[in-house]
């Protein structure tokens, strides 16, 4: 069992050395620093590219309930009763 533990610890030590070695080397200068320094990043207050122009809201279905089918008989509030027209049959008034 100790032989297996020794191999495992040895492999861990070599992995640690591999990960530490590249980090200890000095960092190379960035590739874009070789570009001419006359080009400057845009410092204007332009809108970010991700923002889009204002759009009209998309029309969505406003009804969440299914349409209710009307019955053949209208309700009492919907019935239209014709007004009594007295012009064709005026009330008869008897003279005194």
Curated annotation (Swiss-Prot):
Q: Where is the composition biased (Low complexity)?
A: 59-74
Subcellular localization: Carboxysome
Keywords per UniProt: Bacterial microcompartment, Carbon dioxide fixation, Carboxysome
Q: Work out whether the entry's keyword set contains ATP-binding.
A: no
GO cellular component terms? carboxysome
Q: Name one GO biological process term.
A: carbon fixation
Q: Which domain of life is it from?
A: Bacteria
Q: Does the keyword Cell cycle apply?
A: no
Phenotype upon gene inactivation: Carboxysomes (Cb) are no longer evenly distributed over the nucleoid region on the whole cell length; 66% localize to one cell pole, 5% have Cb at both poles while 29% lack Cbs. Cbs are nucleoid excluded.
Region Disordered: list its residue ranges. 1-96
**Amino acid composition bias (Basic and acidic residues), ranges on this chain:** 1-18
The record's note on quaternary structure and interaction partners says: Monomer, associates with McdA:DNA. Interacts with shell components of the carboxysome.
Describe the task this protein carries out.
McdA and McdB together mediate carboxysome positioning on the nucleoid and to prevent their aggregation in the cell. Undergoes liquid-liquid phase separation at pH 7.0 in the presence of crowders polyethylene glycol or Ficoll. McdA is an ATPase that forms dynamic gradients on the nucleoid in response to adapter protein McdB, which associates with carboxysomes. The interplay between McdA gradients on the nucleoid and McdB-bound carboxysomes result in the equal spacing of Cbs along the cell length. Stimulates the ATPase activity of McdA, causing McdA to be released from DNA.
Query: In its UniProt entry, what is this protein called?
Result: Maintenance of carboxysome distribution protein B
- Gene coding for it: mcdB
